[in-house]
């Protein structure tokens, strides 16, 4: 009996030793596994993977990557800290008084709205339409050759325009380049040039306006539509917000047009090389000097565009841009009033000067490129990845115009703080483009968030085995 008891005790000790050995072995394995997991090097991301992840993110969040929206004014409250003793949120900035039915002011560097009034009110754009005409024409590959010569269609000759309509003087026995045609629209608002652009591009005004409407629809402009290419029709419609967004996209795509077309103070047409037969055409003389309709080119420092417009149904409109010290702003003012044409132009000038002075006096860009270099990796638990590469560095998925800059009040950089909201670990499965965190730029000691940049997973990461999930679960204990 004694020998039997000893045998059982011995067996139990052996069994316990074996169990202890297994437990210690498993613990050692888990410890080693978790140690490797914590030292995991992030997976490399190819350009193809990055592009695919961003496309997935934008698609799921219904964001137009090619034509992002403006930054909502709710994300940029009008606050100003003029003293280090005053919290930034304590002072409200005073907006300029603008005598118009509608306006909006944006920072072109970031797409941030700085001021607005009735910005969604639908108003005929008048000759601002010609900006969309220029854009639509340049979208067609054959019209990107600005030196291309053509003959103005008879339907677009100046003599057939309504009385009082602006023109450059297209007529018979003439030829001109695409560049001259665009300059005629941009500088002196030639309605004959706008009609010629439509006919040359699509063969008919109806087909061309369809292209115009397709272009603005692609940009997400829901209230903007066109019935003609010149802006003479009161049936054309837009809003200050949407036209500011269009103007910004136009400048992003064709920045060279500012110098080539929109900052030109005057043009002469027709010139000698435009006349095919050396005789006057329908009374048009050579070298007719036509000044720019944008009178702000000479009255606002740094002003280099864009376009003015007027019909009785709309009032005095302008899409204005100016740049100084690397800061560019865009203002769209619609429905300016005036008892006379001269008074209307004067008020438009005063409104424009007020908005641009307000912009340049108060706002600037804050470079956040260095801050946006995320070096912190996220460990992935319960995946099928090699333990040594079970981590990734998230991608920035900024749907705004620029993730490189932030619009701030002058001298307020010291009040800005960056907050990275990102988990240290995350469970598989994950898909490329999945948002897993964000960067926030805030005003210190306030609840004001100036900018949010989503952080997304760059890879498709599959779920691992039950055993992998089990041992990864010990991550938090080491």
Language model segments and positions:
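Domain-terminus/edge residues, biased toward the C-terminal soluble/receptor-binding domains
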Residues: 29, 33, 221-222, 234-237, ...
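Membrane-interface motif at the C-terminal end of an N-terminal transmembrane signal
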Residues: 23-40
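Alpha-helical transmembrane segments of integral membrane proteins
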Residues: 10-14, 179, 259
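Active-site-adjacent loops and short helices of periplasmic peptidoglycan-processing enzymes
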Residues: 35-255
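N-terminal Sec-pathway targeting helices
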Residues: 2-20
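Intrinsically disordered, Ser/Thr-rich regulatory regions of eukaryotic membrane-trafficking proteins
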Residues: 19-22, 86
């Amino acid at each position: 009996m004694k020998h039997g008891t000893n045998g059982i005790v011995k067996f139990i000790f052996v069994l316990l030793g074996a169990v202890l050995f297994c437990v210690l072995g498993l613990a050692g394995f888990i410890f080693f596994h978790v140690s490797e997991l914590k030292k995991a090097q992030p997976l490399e991301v190819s350009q193809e993977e990055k592009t695919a992840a961003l496309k997935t993110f934008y698609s799921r969040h219904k964001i137009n990557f090619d034509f992002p929206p403006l930054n909502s004014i709710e994300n940029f409250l009008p606050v100003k800290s003029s003293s280090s003793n005053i919290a930034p949120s304590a002072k409200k900035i005073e907006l300029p008084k603008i005598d118009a039915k509608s306006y909006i002011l944006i920072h072109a560097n970031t797409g941030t709205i700085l001021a607005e009034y009735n910005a969604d009110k639908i108003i005929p754009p008048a000759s601002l339409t010609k900006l969309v005409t220029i854009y639509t024409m340049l979208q067609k590959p054959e019209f990107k050759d600005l030196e291309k010569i053509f003959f103005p269609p008879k339907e677009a000759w100046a003599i057939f325009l309504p009385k009082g309509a602006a023109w450059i003087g297209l007529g018979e026995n003439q030829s001109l380049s695409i560049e001259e045609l665009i300059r005629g629209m941009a500088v002196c608002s030639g309605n004959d040039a706008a009609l010629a652009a439509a006919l040359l591009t699509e063969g008919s005004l109806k087909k061309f306006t369809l292209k115009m409407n397709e272009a603005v629809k692609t940009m997400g402009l829901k209230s903007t539509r066109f019935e003609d290419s010149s802006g003479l029709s009161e049936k054309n419609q837009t809003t200050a917000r949407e036209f500011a967004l269009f103007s910004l996209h136009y400048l992003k795509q064709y920045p060279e047009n500012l110098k080539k077309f929109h900052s030109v103070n005057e043009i002469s047409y027709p010139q000698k090389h435009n006349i095919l037969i050396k005789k006057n055409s329908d009374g048009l003389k050579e070298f007719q000097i036509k000044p720019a309709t944008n009178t702000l080119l000479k009255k606002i420092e740094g002003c280099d565009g864009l376009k003015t417009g007027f019909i009785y149904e709309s009032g005095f409109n302008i899409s204005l841009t100016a740049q100084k010290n690397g800061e560019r702003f865009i203002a769209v003012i619609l429905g300016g009033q005036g008892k006379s044409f001269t008074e209307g132009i004067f008020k438009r000038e005063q409104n424009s000067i007020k908005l641009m002075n307000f912009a340049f006096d108060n706002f600037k860009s804050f470079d956040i490129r260095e801050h946006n270099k995320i070096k912190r990796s996220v460990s992935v638990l319960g995946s099928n990845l090699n333990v040594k590469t079970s981590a990734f560095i998230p991608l920035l998925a900024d749907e705004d115009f620029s993730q490189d800059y932030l619009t701030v009040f002058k001298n307020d950089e010291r009040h800005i703080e960056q907050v990275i909201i990102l988990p240290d670990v995350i469970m598989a499965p994950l898909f490329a483009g999945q948002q897993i965190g964000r960067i926030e730029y805030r005003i210190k000691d306030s609840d004001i968030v100036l900018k949010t940049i989503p952080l997304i997973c760059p890879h498709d990461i599959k779920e691992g085995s039950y055993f992998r999930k089990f041992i990864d679960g010990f991550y938090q204990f080491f």
